[in-house]
């Protein structure tokens, strides 16, 4: 529903009134126990499913029950504490997807510590920068990555490796820490405040330098509850579900919407360390995956792969995509591959914890939804759309900057009050930098990012719109559209295109394909053919890398 709220701000003893158009979920608000520490909330109902499979290690087939995960994470918490990791200390996870990611995150939470996760394929300099910025005291990793971080030992950073074989010199063995006396963990932490930070992901840096995002116990409890709690949860997971986790767990989407949401409801998580299309399809068939949480590059690979015809994918009842909008053509293609699945999207950003909106088609009692929509605002939260030029809130069907307010958003950026103040205003609204609108049925549609909009002679051109058209062409495997400087127009849209296998589609053919479907100022000016589109682990296109190619004359 939408309400016209009169908001009164007291500034210098002068009251000022303004009408804000605020959007809320079509689902009713629910009670959220966000006074609890995250681990207590996650395991609140564990007695009901302690013997049930919790984690399946895809490569090995090893299964951990909920009781195994609970006990082992508590023992690991005691082991970390014995090494000197205290409340508010930071533990870095430098691992591919594995059960140890789950165990380490929960163990840190138990002792009031904070986890920051980094991509193990980062360069040594990138890892070092994050470790130092977060003041990491201990790093959990695999032996093959130790060379990247061993210089940090000079600063007193401890390194724990998860390998079962021989470990590098001066490193500790993960398995030894999990054999510590488990009951001692109860007396370890001081009282954990709901406002204490529990996770410190670093934002993708697609519009600036990476910054530590402080997510609290209260924030993550709220975010998980907004998704999976209540009589009619927005994201209906159940204890019989097998949830696919192929998205990187060092990204907040997998950490929250897959790992934490699954643990809360007692579902089984199938953990896969990397995406490989044939292996993915084999595991879906073998483990009878019911929920596939994906991002557009994976959707694209599945939709365009002939391998899918060889496997039984009928167990999948839900396919949820996030990180970037899907076009209708891609939605239709993936629906054909998963005939029994509901397909929908969610919308989030790290700073929002991360979920702002989610398809109500995923609810236990689903609502009708439209193709291309990114869902409706989550319950127990508020959303508004602002005019980027005037700052006024906008009514339905008017595109503007998306803003969100609620207990789930970040506490702020680590050691960066200026960046925090420019993102969260004095009234608690988080400004996303994304452009979208809410229609007559409360559904959110993303237009693009403010800074990614192309300005052609004053006209705004949204890259996502053109990408959606282009990806529907059968001879195009992947695409990204960015702005290129042009003296007359200011900026013109250009496309980086990955041809489909055996395709020889030309630049002129692509231009004509688009020109027939858009107004004159949205026409593609140039096409550059490339082997791949650079993307962040979250699936978002790294447009700044493509703009750098243009600036350096390295288009092809």
Curated annotation (Swiss-Prot):
<dbReference type="GO" id="GO:0009698">
    <property type="term" value="P:phenylpropanoid metabolic process"/>
</dbReference>
<feature type="binding site">
    <location>
        <position position="204"/>
    </location>
    <ligand>
        <name>ATP</name>
    </ligand>
</feature>
<feature type="binding site">
    <location>
        <position position="211"/>
    </location>
    <ligand>
        <name>ATP</name>
    </ligand>
</feature>
<feature type="binding site">
    <location>
        <position position="207"/>
    </location>
    <ligand>
        <name>ATP</name>
    </ligand>
</feature>
<feature type="binding site">
    <location>
        <position position="323"/>
    </location>
    <ligand>
        <name>(E)-4-coumaroyl-AMP</name>
    </ligand>
</feature>
<dbReference type="GO" id="GO:0005524">
    <property type="term" value="F:ATP binding"/>
</dbReference>
<feature type="binding site">
    <location>
        <position position="205"/>
    </location>
    <ligand>
        <name>ATP</name>
    </ligand>
</feature>
<feature type="binding site">
    <location>
        <position position="449"/>
    </location>
    <ligand>
        <name>ATP</name>
    </ligand>
</feature>
<feature type="binding site">
    <location>
        <position position="350"/>
    </location>
    <ligand>
        <name>ATP</name>
    </ligand>
</feature>
<dbReference type="InterPro" id="IPR045851">
    <property type="entry name" value="AMP-bd_C_sf"/>
</dbReference>
<comment type="similarity">
    <text>Belongs to the ATP-dependent AMP-binding enzyme family.</text>
</comment>
<feature type="binding site">
    <location>
        <position position="434"/>
    </location>
    <ligand>
        <name>ATP</name>
    </ligand>
</feature>
<feature type="binding site">
    <location>
        <position position="346"/>
    </location>
    <ligand>
        <name>ATP</name>
    </ligand>
</feature>
<feature type="binding site">
    <location>
        <position position="457"/>
    </location>
    <ligand>
        <name>CoA</name>
    </ligand>
</feature>
<feature type="binding site">
    <location>
        <position position="451"/>
    </location>
    <ligand>
        <name>(E)-4-coumaroyl-AMP</name>
    </ligand>
</feature>
<feature type="region of interest" description="SBD2">
    <location>
        <begin position="346"/>
        <end position="413"/>
    </location>
</feature>
<feature type="modified residue" description="N-acetylthreonine">
    <location>
        <position position="2"/>
    </location>
</feature>
<dbReference type="InterPro" id="IPR020845">
    <property type="entry name" value="AMP-binding_CS"/>
</dbReference>
<feature type="binding site">
    <location>
        <position position="346"/>
    </location>
    <ligand>
        <name>(E)-4-coumaroyl-AMP</name>
    </ligand>
</feature>
<keyword id="KW-0460">Magnesium</keyword>
<feature type="binding site">
    <location>
        <position position="345"/>
    </location>
    <ligand>
        <name>ATP</name>
    </ligand>
</feature>
<feature type="binding site">
    <location>
        <position position="350"/>
    </location>
    <ligand>
        <name>(E)-4-coumaroyl-AMP</name>
    </ligand>
</feature>
<comment type="pathway">
    <text>Phytoalexin biosynthesis; 3,4',5-trihydroxystilbene biosynthesis; 3,4',5-trihydroxystilbene from trans-4-coumarate: step 1/2.</text>
</comment>
<feature type="region of interest" description="SBD1">
    <location>
        <begin position="276"/>
        <end position="345"/>
    </location>
</feature>
<feature type="binding site">
    <location>
        <position position="206"/>
    </location>
    <ligand>
        <name>ATP</name>
    </ligand>
</feature>
<dbReference type="Pfam" id="PF13193">
    <property type="entry name" value="AMP-binding_C"/>
</dbReference>
<feature type="binding site">
    <location>
        <position position="458"/>
    </location>
    <ligand>
        <name>CoA</name>
    </ligand>
</feature>
<keyword id="KW-0587">Phenylpropanoid metabolism</keyword>
<dbReference type="InterPro" id="IPR042099">
    <property type="entry name" value="ANL_N_sf"/>
</dbReference>
<dbReference type="InterPro" id="IPR025110">
    <property type="entry name" value="AMP-bd_C"/>
</dbReference>
<feature type="binding site">
    <location>
        <position position="455"/>
    </location>
    <ligand>
        <name>(E)-4-coumaroyl-AMP</name>
    </ligand>
</feature>
<comment type="function">
    <text>Produces CoA thioesters of a variety of hydroxy- and methoxy-substituted cinnamic acids, which are used to synthesize several phenylpropanoid-derived compounds, including anthocyanins, flavonoids, isoflavonoids, coumarins, lignin, suberin and wall-bound phenolics. Follows a two-step reaction mechanism, wherein the carboxylate substrate first undergoes adenylation by ATP, followed by a thioesterification in the presence of CoA to yield the final CoA thioesters.</text>
</comment>
<feature type="binding site">
    <location>
        <position position="253"/>
    </location>
    <ligand>
        <name>(E)-4-coumaroyl-AMP</name>
    </ligand>
</feature>
<dbReference type="GO" id="GO:0106286">
    <property type="term" value="F:(E)-caffeate-CoA ligase activity"/>
</dbReference>
<dbReference type="GO" id="GO:0016207">
    <property type="term" value="F:4-coumarate-CoA ligase activity"/>
</dbReference>
<dbReference type="InterPro" id="IPR000873">
    <property type="entry name" value="AMP-dep_synth/lig_dom"/>
</dbReference>
<keyword id="KW-0436">Ligase</keyword>
<feature type="binding site">
    <location>
        <position position="203"/>
    </location>
    <ligand>
        <name>ATP</name>
    </ligand>
</feature>
<feature type="binding site">
    <location>
        <position position="358"/>
    </location>
    <ligand>
        <name>(E)-4-coumaroyl-AMP</name>
    </ligand>
</feature>
<feature type="binding site">
    <location>
        <position position="540"/>
    </location>
    <ligand>
        <name>ATP</name>
    </ligand>
</feature>
<feature type="binding site">
    <location>
        <position position="274"/>
    </location>
    <ligand>
        <name>CoA</name>
    </ligand>
</feature>
<dbReference type="Pfam" id="PF00501">
    <property type="entry name" value="AMP-binding"/>
</dbReference>
């Amino acid at each position: 529903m939408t309400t016209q709220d009169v908001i009164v701000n007291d500034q210098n003893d002068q009251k000022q009134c303004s009408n804000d158009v605020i959007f809320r979920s079509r689902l009713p608000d629910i009670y959220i126990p966000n006074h609890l520490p995250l681990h207590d909330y996650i395991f609140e109902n564990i007695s009901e499913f302690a013997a049930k499979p919790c984690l399946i290690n895809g490569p090995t087939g090893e299964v951990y029950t909920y009781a195994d995960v609970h006990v082992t994470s508590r023992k690991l918490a005691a082991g970390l504490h014995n090494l000197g990791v205290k409340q508010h200390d930071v533990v870095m996870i430098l691992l591919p997807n594995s059960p140890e990611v789950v165990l380490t995150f929960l163990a840190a939470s138990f002792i009031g510590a904070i986890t920051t996760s980094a991509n193990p394929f980062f360069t040594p300099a990138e890892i070092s920068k994050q470790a130092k910025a977060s003041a990491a005291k201990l790093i959990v990793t695999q032996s093959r990555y130790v060379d990247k971080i061993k210089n940090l030992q000079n600063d007193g950073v401890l390194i724990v490796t998860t390998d079962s074989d021989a470990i590098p010199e001066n490193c500790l063995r993960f398995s030894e820490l999990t054999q510590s006396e488990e009951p001692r963990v109860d007396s370890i932490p001081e009282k954990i405040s709901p406002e204490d930070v529990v996770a410190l992901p670093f934002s993708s840096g697609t519009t600036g330098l990476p910054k530590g995002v402080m997510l609290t116990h209260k924030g993550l409890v709220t975010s998980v509850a907004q998704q999976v709690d209540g009589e009619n949860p927005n994201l209906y997971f159940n204890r019989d579900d097998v949830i696919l986790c192929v998205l990187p767990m060092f990204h907040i989407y997998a950490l929250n919407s897959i790992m934490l949401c699954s643990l809360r409801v007692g579902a089984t998580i199938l953990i896969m360390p990397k995406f490989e299309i044939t292996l993915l399809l084999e595991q879906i068939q073998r483990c009878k995956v019911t929920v596939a949480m994906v991002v557009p590059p994976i959707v694209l690979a599945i939709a365009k792969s002939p391998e899918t015809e060889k496997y039984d994918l009928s167990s999948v009842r839900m396919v949820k995509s996030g990180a970037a909008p899907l076009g209708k053509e891609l939605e239709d293609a993936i629906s054909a591959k998963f005939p029994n699945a509901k397909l929908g999207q969610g919308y989030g950003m790290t700073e929002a914890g991360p979920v702002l909106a989610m398809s109500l088609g995923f609810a236990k009692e689903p609502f009708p939804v439209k193709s291309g929509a990114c869902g409706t605002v989550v319950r127990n939260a508020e959303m508004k759309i602002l005019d980027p030029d005037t700052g006024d809130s906008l009514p339905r069907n008017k595109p503007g900057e998306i803003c969100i307010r609620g207990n789930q958003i970040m506490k702020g950026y680590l050691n960066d009050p200026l960046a925090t103040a420019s993102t969260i205003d004095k009234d608690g609204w988080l400004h996303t930098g994304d452009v979208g609108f809410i229609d007559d049925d409360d559904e959110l549609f993303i237009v693009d990012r403010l800074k990614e909009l192309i300005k052609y002679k004053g006209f705004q051109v949204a890259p996502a719109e053109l990408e959606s058209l282009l990806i529907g062409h059968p001879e195009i495997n992947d695409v990204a559209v960015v702005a290129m400087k042009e003296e007359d127009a200011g900026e013109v849209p250009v496309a980086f295109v990955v041809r489909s296998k055996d395709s020889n589609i030309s630049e002129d053919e692509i231009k004509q394909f688009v020109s027939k479907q858009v107004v004159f100022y949205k026409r593609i000016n140039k096409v550059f053919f490339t082997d791949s589109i650079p993307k962040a682990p979250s699936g978002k296109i790294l447009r700044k890398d493509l703009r750098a190619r243009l600036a350096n004359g390295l288009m092809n």
